[in-house]
Each structure stands twice: as C-alpha cells, then as structure tokens.
C-alpha cells in the first residue's frame, strides 16, 4: 500500500464502512429467542435487546477469527460514535471495556446505553453487573437473584394497566416493560388469560423475575416483596403449564390502573415536551374505549388507580369516569388517585361521590421551593398547590382519604430539596413520602438526560447527592427511598 496518508486514510475509512455494513447486516438478521407472543412486542418496544448485543459480540468474534489484527475495541469505539442511537452498541462496548479491565470506560458506556433506552432490561442487567464489578460495595446481582428466588409479587396476577396505544401491562411499564396484549384488538378476558400473561406469571412463580426491572422497581431494590411461602403465593398454582386459582378468582383482574389518557394541566419537562389535552375526536375515541373495554370489567375490580399518564382532574375523560363512581353502584371498589394536586380542590371534590371509596392519594410534587416548582411543574402555581394540599390534608384527617402520599422524582435540578420536602410532607400529615430516580420517558436527548441523571457517579454533583441521601430527614419513618438506594 502507498505511504500517502491521504490514500491510507481513505482506504481505512472504506474498510471501516464495509465493516459497519457487515455488522449492521448481522444485527438485522439476528433472531430474537423470546417466545413469539413476546418477540413481536419486543420488536416495537425494545424491552430486551440482548439478542442485538449478542449479535454484535458474535460478529466481533468472527472478524477477529478471520483477521487476528482486527482491533475489536477500537472498532466499537469508532462505531459507537457514528451509531449513537442504538443502546445495544454501547452495551457491547461496555462489555468490551470490562474484558479489557477498563472500569471507568465500561461504566461510562453502559450509562450511555441506559440514557438511550431506559426500559431495556438487558442494559439494566449489564449495568448492575458492571457496577458491582467496578465497585464491590454496590449491590451484588447474584445476591439479588437469590432474594428474588425466594420471594413473590402479586402484580402479574392482579394488575391490568392501560396505556394510550391500547397495550396492557401487569405492572408499571417501567418496572415490567412487557405488554400482555392490546385492548383495542382483543377482549380483556382473552388478554388476561393469554400466553404472554401466563409467561409473566410463570417468571414470578419460578423465582426468576426475568421480565422485571431490578433497577427501577422499588419493591425489588428495597426488598419489600412477600416471601414465596406467603398466603399470596400459595393462592396461585400451575397445572399443565397454566395458572389456576385456589383461593383467588383469576378470570378478570382485581386492580385496574388507567393510564390511557395523557391529558394533563401541566407540562412537566421530565414527562413531556408540551401540554397535552385530548381534542374532541380523541375524547370521543377515549369514551368509546371506556364504554366498550373498561366499564365491562369494572364490576369485577376491587381497586382502580387513576392515573399514571396525566392527571385525573386535568383529563376530561378521567374526570367523567370519576363522576360515575359511587358506593351504591360499585360497593366493593376502592379508588387510588395520582395527581399533581393543582385542580384537586374543594369544588372538584364536591363534584364527586367518592366518599368512603378513596384508599390512597399520591400528590406528585418534585420540589419544596416555589422557584424549583415553577420549572419542574411547568404551568403550575406553588401557591395554589399549597392551598390544595391543606384541603387534601383535611380530607385525610377526616378519614375521606385512607392514605396520603407525596412523591418526588430526584434529578440534578431538585435533589438538594429532598430533606425540605420530607419536612414539608410531615407538616401536611402525610403517611408516606416516595422518592424515585428520574427516568427518560423519551423527552430528553441522551445528553440532556445525563445532565439531570444525578444517580451517575460521573455527574459532578453525585457526591453531594450521596450526602443528601445520608441526611437525617431521609431516614425518617415515612420515607420510602424507592430505587434511589441502587445509586448509593
């Protein structure tokens, strides 16, 4: 080859481009080993991209075998800079760094993968493995596996969560990101007894929890699951590969979590880029969906939760649903409300007939100061919030609400206020304060998310975050640290 550096550079670029083409072809041909009922959903939602990472590693092995001078790490470094939207590439890069003994680089690469796709279970598993390898004081993934093998979660046997596209989940989609069907295409009964639902339940019963997020689920990270020997676990058994009830009726779900309308009176940056209110046509479709798909299974439910997608009072659709709920029509039904509290005032309460039905109210706040609230709750008024909190607190004191919780999503912008937030919650007589780490719901670029993700050891304020977690307020009885414990 000529010694001309320009010619050499062009040849190198051409060779690299050809290698990229072959790698992309291998990834494209990769077979997803998940059962067919899950593989189709994985194609669109990408909840487990392990097969893509495996395809990358296999291709690197082939290239190295064919050409011993092939530098797999250098290639992946170059490839990741030009294929920066595929988390599988960064997972593979993290694994290569780990093989080379490069701890900081491995952590940086896997953090990038996580920033690109928050619900990819494989990225999460690799993150936990690499973090423990780099820092043995971190949570040991094998110890967590052993814990899960002896414990049980009732959610896949009880919960039925709707989302805007019609998909149904048996838990929060961030905690168990695998849909079991689509209510716009199938009946609730068919979905609830379907193959996907059965597989998710089997993953609990066999102790693998293979479809659950060990990173985002607070019940897993805080180890608050019931023992597998508990009554809840023994009320379910499997015959011939299918779950059959002993003491529970599994014909229909007992808990409905309605998150199919994203309408909200606020535009919180961690949740959405702009205000979302259902237009007339959308409202009509939502009402038809309610009448045809939700109302028929409501009489079997024992708990309804509104809403994890927007606000129950900021949504005309959900507010209309709340107005038809009453003790006479649904004598066994309890109601959970998840709201920003801006519209939950005396007038809104008077429009409802929920007396004696409200089990839990969770107010999502994320701030203890007006100036921070103005940013994290775009469109909201801190003064209005405080007025409404006083009213809601009085409902709790009067027994109209059985449990009152405040929630806080920790991020770079607000984490300094966590101790003050606990004190604020105590002032209003709150039963529980829920903390969780910020997640990327698709509203942030990878760079923007990295700037807010205070749980990364690479964040310039990470050490200060650890100090805040050790504050006296964060150890008080009403505090649940959620998944924050994983980032210590």
Q: What positions do the PLM features span?
A:
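"A position-specific structural signal for the A-helix of alpha-solenoid helical repeats
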Residues: 58, 92, 126-129
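Radical SAM enzyme [4Fe-4S]-AdoMet core and its adjacent flexible, acidic
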Residues: 118, 132-186, 259, 280-287, ...
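Conserved alpha-helical substructure of the radical SAM core
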Residues: 179-180, 219-361, 371-389, 395, ...
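Membrane-interface junctions of multi-pass transporters
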Residues: 176-219
């Amino acid at each position: 080859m000529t010694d001309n550096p320009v010619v050499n550079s062009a040849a190198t670029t051409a060779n690299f481009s050809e290698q990229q083409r072959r790698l992309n072809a291998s990834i494209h041909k990769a077979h997803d080993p998940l059962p067919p009922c899950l593989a189709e959903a994985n194609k669109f939602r990408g909840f487990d991209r392990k097969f893509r990472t495996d395809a990358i590693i296999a291709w690197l092995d082939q290239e190295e075998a064919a050409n011993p001078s092939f530098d797999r790490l250098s290639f992946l470094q170059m490839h990741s800079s030009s294929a920066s939207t595929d988390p599988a590439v960064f997972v593979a890069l993290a694994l290569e760094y780990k093989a080379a003994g490069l701890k900081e680089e491995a952590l940086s690469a896997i953090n990038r993968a996580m920033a690109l796709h928050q619900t990819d279970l494989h990225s999460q598993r690799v993150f936990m493995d690499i973090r423990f390898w780099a820092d043995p004081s971190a949570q040991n993934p094998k110890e967590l596996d052993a814990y899960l093998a002896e414990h049980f979660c009732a959610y896949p046997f009880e919960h039925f969560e709707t989302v805007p596209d019609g998909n149904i989940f048996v838990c929060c989609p961030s905690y168990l990101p695998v849909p079991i069907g689509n209510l716009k295409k199938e009946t609730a009964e068919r979905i609830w007894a379907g193959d996907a639902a059965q597989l998710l339940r089997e993953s609990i019963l066999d102790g693998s929890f293979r479809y659950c997020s060990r990173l985002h689920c607070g019940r897993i990270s805080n180890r608050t699951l019931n023992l597998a020997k508990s009554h809840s676990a023994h009320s379910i058994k499997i015959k011939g590969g299918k779950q059959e009830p002993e003491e529970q009726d599994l014909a229909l779900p007992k808990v409905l979590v309605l998150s199919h309308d994203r309408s909200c009176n606020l535009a919180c940056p961690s949740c959405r880029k702009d205000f979302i209110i259902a237009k007339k046509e959308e409202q009509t479709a939502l009402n038809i969906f309610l009448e045809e798909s939700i109302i028929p299974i409501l009489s079997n439910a024992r708990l309804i939760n509104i809403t994890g997608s927007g606000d129950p009072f900021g949504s005309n659709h959900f507010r209309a649903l709340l107005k038809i709920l009453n003790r006479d029509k649904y004598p066994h039904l309890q109601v959970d409300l998840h709201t920003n509290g801006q519209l939950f005032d005396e007038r809104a309460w008077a429009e409802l007939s929920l007396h004696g039905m409200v089990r839990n109210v969770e107010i999502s706040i994320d701030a203890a100061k007006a100036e921070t609230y103005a940013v994290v709750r775009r469109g909201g008024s801190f003064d209005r919030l405080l007025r409404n909190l006083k009213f809601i607190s009085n409902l709790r004191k009067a027994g109209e609400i059985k449990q009152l919780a405040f929630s806080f999503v920790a991020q770079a912008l607000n984490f300094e206020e966590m101790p003050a937030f606990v004190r604020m919650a105590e002032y209003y007589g709150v039963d529980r304060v829920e903390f969780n780490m910020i997640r990327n719901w698709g509203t942030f670029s990878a760079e923007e998310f990295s700037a807010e993700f205070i749980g990364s050891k690479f964040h310039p304020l990470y050490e200060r975050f650890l100090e805040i977690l050790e504050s006296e307020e964060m150890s008080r009885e009403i505090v649940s640290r959620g998944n924050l414990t994983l980032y210590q």
